[in-house]
């Protein structure tokens, strides 16, 4: 049946990790920080165990069980599982395109997971104006934290994200006009081993993900 349907004979020997290695090698069109995050998620949650599965043997029930394990045993939030799914689904799509699978076993699995689990969504609550003033007052009057005052004052006054604020250069600031040009973000790449051990980290600047991110405030 496999040969009749165009499935490669070597499919029985190819693991999910093998397909991920190929996917990572040929994938284009992602911001570097997004790509690095995908690599981290796969290596942290998929590669050690589920990644050793033979691609041709994967069934939808296997993917369901894997996601249930992430939710029930590892306690991951739905947002993290969603990100893992984004990577896994692309890898399995490539396996289908390359004739290692007939169909993608991860199709619609995440939707079913969301229905089956009662995930709690933590709503973010913005600081009130009074709370913002109290924070700035505390920072300015506490010697231990005074060095944090300028960046918090800028972020609260402009709405800049952390990466946007920490990536500012003097050439981005016009003191006479009282404006800031936002045209890049500072990104921290934190590389870890599968066991959580750090290998090192570095910083880099990237353009915003969307055109709307480039602005003057």
Outline where the language-model segments fall.
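C-terminal catalytic core of Y-nucleophile DNA break-rejoin enzymes
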Residues: 181, 190-200, 204-217
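Secondary-structure transition/turn motif
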Residues: 68-72, 181-188
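N-terminal core-binding DNA-recognition domain of tyrosine site-specific recombinases/integrases
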Residues: 12, 24-105, 123, 143-144
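N-terminal alpha-helical segment
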Residues: 16-19, 62-63, 147-148
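Basic, Lys/Arg- and aromatic-enriched nucleic-acid-binding interface segment
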Residues: 78, 82-86, 97, 101-103, ...
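Short, surface-exposed polybasic/aromatic micro-patch for ligand or macromolecular engagement
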Residues: 1-13, 208-210
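Short, structural beta-strand-to-alpha-helix junction motif
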Residues: 14-19, 54, 169
């Amino acid at each position: 049946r496999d040969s009749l349907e165009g499935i490669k004979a070597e499919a029985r020997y190819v693991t999910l990790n093998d397909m991920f290695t190929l996917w990572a090698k040929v994938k284009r069109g992602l911001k570097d920080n997004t790509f690095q995050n995908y690599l981290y998620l796969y290596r942290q949650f998929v590669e050690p165990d589920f990644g050793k599965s033979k691609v041709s043997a994967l069934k939808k029930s296997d993917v369901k069980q894997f996601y249930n394990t992430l939710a029930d045993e590892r306690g991951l939030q739905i947002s993290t599982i969603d990100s893992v799914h984004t990577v896994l689904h692309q890898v399995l799509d490539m396996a289908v395109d390359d004739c290692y699978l007939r169909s993608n076993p991860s199709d619609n699995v995440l939707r079913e997971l969301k229905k089956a689990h009662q995930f709690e969504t933590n709503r973010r609550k913005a600081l009130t104006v009074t709370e913002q003033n109290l924070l700035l007052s505390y920072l300015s009057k506490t010697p231990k934290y005074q060095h944090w005052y300028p960046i918090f004052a800028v972020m609260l006054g402009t709405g800049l994200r952390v990466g946007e604020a920490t990536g500012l250069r003097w050439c981005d600031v016009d003191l006479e006009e009282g404006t800031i040009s936002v045209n890049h973000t500072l990104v921290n790449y934190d590389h870890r081993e599968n066991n959580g051990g750090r290998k090192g980290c570095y910083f880099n600047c990237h353009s915003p993900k969307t055109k709307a991110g480039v602005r003057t405030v």
